[in-house]
Amino acid sequence: MSHNFHVIIPARYHSSRFPGKLLQEINGITVIERVYRQALLAEPKSVIIATDHDEIADRAIQFGAEVVITSHTHQTGTDRIAEVIAKGSFAPDDVIVNVQGDEPFIRPKLIQQVACSLTKTKAPVSTLCWPISSLEILNNPNVVKVVCTRDNHALYFSRSAIPFHRDDKNAYSNTFRHIGLYAYRAAFLLEFVSWPPCTLEQIECLEQLRILWSGFSIRVDEACEEPLQDINTKEDLILAQQYFLDTFNV
C-alpha cells in the first residue's frame, strides 16, 4: 500500500567534507542505493533521485531508481528538489519529503511520520527533532539545535547551544537536535526557493531560517524512533560499515 506523498533524494557528488560519499559502499551496496531502499520501505507514491552527476545517475538507473538530471549550479538540496518539482507533474498540494542522500539507514517510519505531520498542520513545512543526550552534542556546531513553541512550531534553529542554561552550563535537559528530514507542499517549496537568502540563514548557514524569517511556521515533532547517523566524513562511513556488521551479524 502506497502513502500519499513523494520522496525526492537530492544526490550531490561534490560534498565539501567527503566528495563521492554517496558512491561509497556499505557491505557491497552504495550509500545512495541504501537510502533509496529505505525510502521505498516507507511506501511513498514515488521515489526520485535528483542529481547532476553522471556516475550517480548511471548507478541509480542500474538499481532501478527514477532519476532526474538537475543543474550543477544548485547551492542546496532544496533547490535541486524544486527543479524536479518544476519539471514534473506534481499538484500544488502534493506532499514532498526531502530525504538526504547520505542517510543509508534512514528509518522508514520517520519518513512516514514527517509526511503525515504535514497533512495535520497548517504550517507549510514539517520536520523532526530528537532529545540531546550529552553536553558534547549540545556544544557541537555541526549539530543543529531547535527550540519550539508549546504547540510544536519552531522558534529558532541554531548551531549554538539553545536554550542556554544560565545557572548550569553543564546541563542539557530540554534541548533538542534537529533531524534534517523535511516535508513540504510542492507549491510552497517552489515559492521558498524563489526568496533570496536572509541574514540569519547566511550567518548560521541554515536555509530553514529563511522560512521563519519570511513569517512562515515550521512544524517540529519529536521523532517516533531514534534517528541513525548520517555520513559526512570518512570516519562516519567506517562507523556505518561497522554498524551494519554489528546489526546484521554479517
From Swiss-Prot:
<dbReference type="GO" id="GO:0008690">
    <property type="term" value="F:3-deoxy-manno-octulosonate cytidylyltransferase activity"/>
</dbReference>
<keyword id="KW-0548">Nucleotidyltransferase</keyword>
<dbReference type="InterPro" id="IPR029044">
    <property type="entry name" value="Nucleotide-diphossugar_trans"/>
</dbReference>
<keyword id="KW-0963">Cytoplasm</keyword>
<protein>
    <recommendedName>
        <fullName>3-deoxy-manno-octulosonate cytidylyltransferase</fullName>
        <ecNumber>2.7.7.38</ecNumber>
    </recommendedName>
</protein>
<dbReference type="GO" id="GO:0009103">
    <property type="term" value="P:lipopolysaccharide biosynthetic process"/>
</dbReference>
<keyword id="KW-0448">Lipopolysaccharide biosynthesis</keyword>
<dbReference type="GO" id="GO:0033468">
    <property type="term" value="P:CMP-keto-3-deoxy-D-manno-octulosonic acid biosynthetic process"/>
</dbReference>
<comment type="function">
    <text>Activates KDO (a required 8-carbon sugar) for incorporation into bacterial lipopolysaccharide in Gram-negative bacteria.</text>
</comment>
<comment type="pathway">
    <text>Nucleotide-sugar biosynthesis; CMP-3-deoxy-D-manno-octulosonate biosynthesis; CMP-3-deoxy-D-manno-octulosonate from 3-deoxy-D-manno-octulosonate and CTP: step 1/1.</text>
</comment>
<comment type="pathway">
    <text>Bacterial outer membrane biogenesis; lipopolysaccharide biosynthesis.</text>
</comment>
<dbReference type="InterPro" id="IPR003329">
    <property type="entry name" value="Cytidylyl_trans"/>
</dbReference>
<dbReference type="Pfam" id="PF02348">
    <property type="entry name" value="CTP_transf_3"/>
</dbReference>
<keyword id="KW-0808">Transferase</keyword>
<dbReference type="GO" id="GO:0005829">
    <property type="term" value="C:cytosol"/>
</dbReference>
<comment type="similarity">
    <text>Belongs to the KdsB family.</text>
</comment>
<dbReference type="InterPro" id="IPR004528">
    <property type="entry name" value="KdsB"/>
</dbReference>
